[in-house]
Amino acid sequence: MLHASTIWHLRSTPPRRKQWGHCDPHRILVASEVTTEITSPTPAPRAQVCGGQPWVTVLDPLSGHTGREAERHFATVSISAVELKYCHGWRPAGQRVPSKTATGQRTCAKPCQKPSTSKVILRAVADKGTCKYVSLATLKKAVSTTGYDMARNAYHFKRVLKGLVDKGSAGSFTLGKKQASKSKLKVKRQRQQRWRSGQRPFGQHRSLLGSKQGHKRLIKGVRRVAKCHCN
């Protein structure tokens, strides 16, 4: 029969290939004892709790120590040889995660968006100053300066501008042409109505011929001969 000390010695000396990288019950027992001794005072600023219990990483390997000698060596390990590590994503109370703004790099949560075309147009109209009118070229230049491609967004630009004019937000505008006066537009409208109703346009004289022959034209080179009435 084996003695109890012999069994303890056999358990404390695992094979060489399993000495590192595998679970060792003796080392787990000793590590738990050292953990309780180290963390009994106030934890260091970098100390933390992972799963309710602090965990440590021993920097000094225990090669060459077996059995009771390993236990004594573990008990005399200095605190400077133990590094308390952080769990992933955990920080002690009162300590914030260092942001990139503290190092001088400014980060934006959302990418900076360009203002809409309507806002750019309204801003250009509001900033016209003493000028009474704003040309279409000025509006296009303001939109293109914001970052829009006018060659691709020409149709969208006209639609937005027409919508603003219909709402009355941007006043009236002319697309490079002179608007006719109201009196000229009224005369033109009256002429169109007369032509549709069949009335004779203003300034056209009545034919000298009879009403029956008024719309008939005489053929060139043909003369009418006077009729003689014989009694």
From Swiss-Prot:
It holds the Pfam family Linker_histone. Residues 179-194 have a biased composition (Basic residues). GO terms for biological process: chromatin remodeling; chromosome condensation; germ cell development; heterochromatin formation; negative regulation of DNA recombination; nucleosome assembly; regulation of DNA-templated transcription; spermatogenesis. GO terms for cellular component: male germ cell nucleus; nucleosome; nucleus. It comes from the Eukaryota. GO terms for molecular function: double-stranded DNA binding; histone binding; nucleic acid binding; nucleosomal DNA binding. Its main location: nucleus. Expressed exclusively in the testis. Transmembrane segments: none annotated. Residues 177-214 are annotated as: Disordered. The modification Phosphoserine is found at S135. InterPro entries: Histone_H1/H5_H15 (IPR005818), WH-like_DNA-bd_sf (IPR036388), WH_DNA-bd_sf (IPR036390). Residues 113-177 form the H15 domain. The keyword Transcription regulation applies. Gene3D superfamilies: Winged helix-like DNA-binding domain superfamily/Winged helix DNA-binding domain (1.10.10.10). It is found in: Nucleus; Chromosome. Belongs to the histone H1/H5 family. DNA-binding protein that may be implicated in chromatin remodeling and/or transcriptional regulation during spermiogenesis, the process of spermatid maturation into spermatozoa. This is Putative histone H1.9. It comes from Homo sapiens (Human).
